[in-house]
């Protein structure tokens, strides 16, 4: 096993990324402005809804949604009594390593009962309040001392009774906020508890009440839109050229797994079309051109099945089993809600609500091959201090050790890196490189304009539509041959791709849905499923 092949792939990928950066992405400036105006108005609407609901939940206690401490009190109905002791108890904060860089401290470990006792004994219940005007300062927040002659001093002092706010908040017996229950020490922060969208969304499958669920959904939407406006809309506005093009910088050596990242602007974490339609602003550089996108179906799940040789994964892929429906049944949620949890166990997901943990246990039992492989990865990391992929790519874990609970440190990374690395740092680049070669060999005007994790995006010239579809299909389905040529790997997992095309990157129509299954013969032939006669000839 050698890193030479990985280095060669990286160099080939660098040439392709250079072409993509130089080609750039065309932006519809008018659509971008319309999007910004529309969602800026939506954030104003959501903020009004959130403030009204927060007032109902907290009484007269003011809540600043930009304050992590206020959000923690609102969602969890508890307030930290001593922040210094709190940080020490849960080992919250950062430390400087031997290289001088800062990193998060390793959190203290608790079982569920001990954690519950620890956080409750170090926080106080938050109650609703009733506001009244301070009688000392008459609501002005400041007072004056009376001089010996009976007149008031000109010097004004902050009122001690109301701390300068002019209002007295009197507690009543009703609990304030939404009374969420933190699950582990990882949910603790310096100000209380986590209130990020990922954490809050996990509570939507719990029995927390309709008001809490409605508020979480509204807050997560508000928070997401603010992030999207800042990251994508403002990012595009800063990077766009006078000719309405952006040229993102793609990087192979930033993420720990080797997955691509990009900046100026960030185009690797694009939101789904139904979440934030920024993709509508991406159009073809030709007046009657098209945007063509090819996606791999369940790429990381299939890669996990291949690396672990899990027979259940092979069987379900070949039969077209809907894995999200299994998740939905186990968690008693809709299929759409289930999607966020389906593949979490691939990366070591074990904690969460009761329903989530029930599903995670069922996943481990159903996909016993993946579970056994996860255990073997942990053993390999402990023994060799590194993990090696079939491609030769290595991930170092010099400080990995056993925990007192029987697991290993860096458990999530040990499970995640091989899957994400082989899928998006090995397989996807091979397809991208081969597709770029096909475009050049056919002297196409159409260009690859973007790639996002498990997809390839083409800007298609209007006269090259059919050929571009065929070449992209061929490029994406080249994984079997490319694995064999580059690494002498027999990639035996069926490959599924979906192609969509449209006038912009949002409004795409499905045009192709293929499943390719490698045969077991030494000639390495493939079975083509759902492919037209014309495409079969071209491929």
Segments predicted by a language model, with ranges:
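Conserved "right-hand" nucleotidyltransferase catalytic core of DNA-directed polymerases
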Residues: 1-273, 286-290, 357, 361, ...
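Glycine- and acidic
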Residues: 2, 21, 25-33, 214-219, ...
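Structured core elements
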Residues: 17, 26, 64, 261, ...
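Conserved catalytic core of nucleic-acid polymerases
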Residues: 18, 22, 129-154, 159, ...
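Flexible loop/turn segments at secondary-structure boundaries
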Residues: 72-73, 167-169, 257, 262, ...
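Function-dense linear segments that define catalytic or interfacial modules
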Residues: 248-334
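A common structural junction motif
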Residues: 474-486
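Catalytic core regions of nucleotide second-messenger enzymes
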Residues: 486-493
